[in-house]
């Protein structure tokens, strides 16, 4: 029984969803980050503004879970994955003929752009682990889209 058959052939609907999604990601990445680093927007934050070592941040959060409140821990681990699941669904909806490998490259470039702008503007922390977690989220989104397409929930 197909209760959720969605006809998303209208590119307009997908474009609006993507624009809303990008706005949300930019808000979380730049405006929302000030709640994690008080004073950042005033230019007085003096903490580390980058991590170029793969798995350093992930390891810190996973092996020192007791040192962080749940919100901080969740945002910096699972939140980074969850944030990018929608783009893994939306790109194939907008560009159905695009190969999955190219979709992953677009997701990687989107994440790298956000992290680079955070580094340059100092409105966040450039973290290679965020790029890895974001890419994992995008990949999960691609897999979800593929599953839903096979089940014919998307036309």
Locations of the language-model features?
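Bulky hydrophobic segments
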Residues: 1-123, 142, 146-155
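Alpha-helical transmembrane segments that form the membrane-embedded catalytic/substrate-binding core
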Residues: 125-145
